[in-house]
Amino acid sequence: MTQDMNDSPGLFDKYLSENRIFRDREVLRHSYRPHILPHRKPQIDQIAAILAPALQTETPSNILIYGKTGTGKTASVRYVGSELESVSARRGTVCRVIHLNCEVIDTQYRVLAQISKLIMGEDETPSDKIKTHIPMTGWPTDQVYSELKNQIELNSGVFIIILDEIDKLVKKSGDDTLYNLTRINTDLNRSKVSIIGISNDLGFKTFLDPRVLSSLSEEELVFPPYNAPQLCDILQQRAVIGFAEDALEDEVIPLCAALAAQEHGDARRALDLLRISGELADRENGSKVTVEHVKKAQAKIETDSMVECIRTLPTQSKIVLYCMLLLHRAGQRIFISGDVTRIYKELTPFLEIDVLTARRISDLISELNMLGVINTRLVNRGRHGRTKEMWFDTNTDKIWEVIMEESDGRLAQVDEQIVVQILR
């Protein structure tokens, strides 16, 4: 048996042969940082102008940066930050850029502790005075803040603190973190701190105290969505490095750009489309990426997004969606909110969950519509009044599979014939 296995082709041999599609697929990922960011020079120049005083050991203005996902906000700020640190090192001044993702680090304690950790980590020869490492939990917040101030002061210089996804921090933990950080300069003598907040959500400002907003938004920048020609340029820049010569049909990049332009000009979506198209061609052992591969990649991305969306739904939303799936599987291609409510109320005793009102069920249906899981429309039924009709415009097999996985086996025990009995 061992001999047979040794003589047979290795499981990965076909994937290790010369790749006819990719030269370096890593350049097609979001994490890759190109040396030039196409169509973002005005924004980069603005950020550089605002941060330039740091090179004179002066305090730069705080900045709030807005823009939808995939519009180059983080990449532009990181690019300027890297250039700032390089110029600072050549001039013999101290400018440090500290980047935090507030989707992950989303409490005041963790933000302050992480800033401290990054400051300590960047100091190759720390002062003997700075021996205290702030633990990630356990201290009173005022002690963490006091220790962070000491570390900033003893590492004298200008610190640019980037709070990416700042809206996630504010929505979860309030604006205390920003209140403290925007006022930290009043307690410093040898160092300066500037804050850059990056957000996809303009509305998060409503969560801020006016004093915090005033301090934080000394400068505001908006990153507009990319249009299709701009996305073409971005993809072309990456494709030259990432794909083998002649691996792409001429129509592939324009199609990826056009599809992503429809999704609010999202460069990340465009890159994902191009990379996944290449991966599909590669797995087929093809020599070219075609328009058909792009169409398959688009369908795959949409399915993956839908699956992730459904997995993160609250339990009650999953139950309401399950009721709709039962109707669909019973042959009801268009169904009304009243039918969903009747099935829901029949199932709740078996599922041992709190029973929602018809109004709340209608709200959950509206949320599922906004997420793109279902389609709805209001129709007038004469003397019976208005009602909400709904339907699925996608294959429901994957949705059903995810709902079954997420239900801990409870829904698998439901007799689907219950729908027929209820609707008689």
From Swiss-Prot:
Pfam families: AAA_16 (PF13191), Cdc6_C (PF09079), Cdc6_lid (PF22703). ATP binds at T71, G72, K73, T74, A75, Y226, R238. InterPro entries: AAA+_ATPase, AAA_16, Cdc6_C, Cdc6_lid, ORC1/CDC6, Orc1/Cdc6_arc, P-loop_NTPase, WH-like_DNA-bd_sf. It comes from the Archaea. One of its GO terms (molecular function) is ATP hydrolysis activity. Belongs to the CDC6/cdc18 family. PANTHER family: CELL DIVISION CONTROL PROTEIN 6-RELATED, ORC1-TYPE DNA REPLICATION PROTEIN. Involved in regulation of DNA replication. This is ORC1-type DNA replication protein. The gene is cdc6.
